[in-house]
UniProtKB/Swiss-Prot annotation:
The chain crosses the membrane at residues 38-58, 72-92, 113-133, 146-166, 187-207, 211-231, 263-283, 292-312, 333-353, 376-396, 411-431, 436-456. This is Protein DETOXIFICATION 5. It is found in: Membrane. One of its GO terms (molecular function) is xenobiotic transmembrane transporter activity. Belongs to the multi antimicrobial extrusion (MATE) (TC 2.A.66.1) family. It is a multi-pass membrane protein. Keywords: Membrane, Transmembrane, Transmembrane helix, Transport.
Length: 477
């Protein structure tokens, strides 16, 4: 059983808190707490990110048509399905995290169960859309053969989406209690399980690209199984795996109250990146532009898992301490997350900039592509900085419970600022893919600025009071 990360009065030096020596001691302690969670969570996110990527890579060896169809289906499925599942459970980072801090342990199990039940009908609705994905793509002007492969792949992804409806709440159930090592072991085991299963279904069973999609579903359900077994039999979850039926209806209401804006935060951001790739096909020399922007997007997405891990750790620490009534510790968790972001982004940006002349060869042997990637490397380094900052502050929003503000911030940042700037520079400014990527940076920068202003203006004492009212208010009546 892992040690709890909540800081009690005996662990936090409260006397003369604003003095430099005392503040630094508390900050160092909190930095250690956030770091101990951020590293495992980043590894968990990397493992989960690589799982569908491996399926795309294996399916791509079935032929160019299969690669195009699978890539198209994956992009659409991420925005219309998996992104929604990932976003909705952001509500649990608020509710379960603050309930754990407030020692309302049975509510953690109730919130998690209500999330799973609430996710299932949403999966059914999304699945109906996926059944007609091929016809949708054809109506949007996509190649009929590619659309047929994409539609078939999407239908085979439905079991994976249903698994995510269970896996994501279980992940947040453990994360918000600081139980990140079980998540780490399960994620790595699942990734190792997925590789042979994918190869067997695609080649040994002759299922082709559809086998790659089915392998994702099998691997996700395998992860659900081992997570569920841990939750059921581990003594670390003994207090929190309970269920209170009287709180179920209220829990569902609260889940959607925070889950819908949280899902909006995710899908608004993810959809802009997919729109970027689709738009690159309308530029002069679309093959080059699409290839280079796909490389930039892949690199940026892979890097983002690190600040996402920091954001998840920060979210947990903030929600735990607000629920426990420790606003000063929650404030320190914000500073700790920002410090880790700056350190990580500086290292990764410096490394990429140093290798910018050879970086493109990791993806292509074409000198034209490599030279273009080199030209965009400076912008990609800047993306590392601003995207990481936004990811950490997204965690602050989820931990504090102001996802609705975060959703509106994303609308303003990405669709009122980022997208117009990108399209103007890319098409009318004749900067092509470079202009589109500048639009992404503008959107991420605007998002970070808005979230930073909101965070700076927060009254943490008020946030702690809201957390207590949110979690235990009904109990105290």
């Amino acid at each position: 059983m892992e040690d709890p990360l909540l800081l009690g009065d005996d662990q936090l030096i409260t006397r003369n808190l604003k003095s430099t020596p005392t503040w630094w001691m508390n900050f160092t302690a909190e930095l250690k707490n956030v770091s101990s969670m951020a590293a495992p969570m980043a590894t968990v996110t990397v493992s989960q990110y690589l799982l569908p990527v491996i399926s795309v890579m294996v399916a791509g060896h079935c032929g160019e048509l299969q690669l195009s169809g699978v890539t198209l289906a994956t992009a659409f499925a991420n925005v219309s399905g998996f992104g929604i599942m990932y976003g909705l459970v952001g509500a649990l980072e608020t509710l379960c995290g603050q309930a754990y801090g407030a020692k309302q342990y049975t509510k953690i199990g109730t919130y998690t169960f209500s999330a799973i039940v609430s996710n299932v009908p949403i999966v059914v609705l999304i699945s109906i859309l996926w059944f007609y994905m091929d016809k949708l793509f054809v109506s949007l002007g996509q190649d009929p053969d590619i659309s047929k492969v994409a539609g078939s792949y999407a239908v085979c992804l439905i079991p994976a989406l249903l698994a995510q409806a269970v896996q994501q709440p279980l992940t947040r159930f453990l994360q918000t209690q600081g139980l990140v090592l079980p998540l780490l072991y399960c994620a790595i085991t699942t990734l190792l399980f997925h590789i042979p299963v994918c190869l067997i279904l695609v080649y040994a069973f002759g299922l082709g690209s559809n086998g790659a999609a089915l392998a994702i579903g099998l691997s996700y359900w395998f992860n659900v199984l081992i997570l569920a077994l841990y939750v059921r039999f581990s003594s670390a979850c003994e207090k929190t795996r309970g269920f209170v039926s009287d709180d179920f209806v209220l829990s569902v209401k609260q889940f959607f109250q925070y889950g819908i804006p949280s899902a909006a935060m995710t899908t608004i951001e993810w959809s802009l990146f997919e729109l970027l790739i689709l738009s690159s096909g309308l530029l002069p020399n679309p093959k080059l532009e699409t290839s280079v922007l796909s490389i930039c997007l892949t690199t940026s997405s892979l890097h983002c898992v690190i600040p996402m891990g920091i954001g998840a750790a920060g979210s947990t620490r903030i929600s735990n301490e607000l629920g426990a009534g420790n606003p000063e510790v929650a404030r320190l968790a914000v500073f700790a997350g920002i410090f880790l972001w700056f350190l990580e982004a500086t290292i990764c940006s410096t490394l990429l900039f140093t290798c910018k002349n050879i970086f493109g060869y990791a993806f292509s042997n074409s000198k034209e592509v490599v030279d273009y990637v080199t030209e965009l490397s400076s912008l990609l380094c800047l993306s590392f900085m601003v995207d990481g900052f936004s990811s950490v502050l997204d965690g602050v929003a989820r931990g504090s419970g102001w996802q609705n503000i975060g959703a509106w911030a994303n609308v303003v940042a990405y669709y009122l600022l980022g997208a117009p700037v990108g399209f103007f520079l890319g098409f009318w400014g004749h900067m092509n893919g470079k202009g589109l990527w500048i639009g992404v940076i503008v959107g991420s920068t605007a998002q970070g600025i808005i979230l930073a202003i909101v965070t700076a203006c927060l009254s943490w004492e008020e946030q702690a009071a809201k957390a207590r009212e949110r979690i235990v208010g009904r109990t105290l009546e």
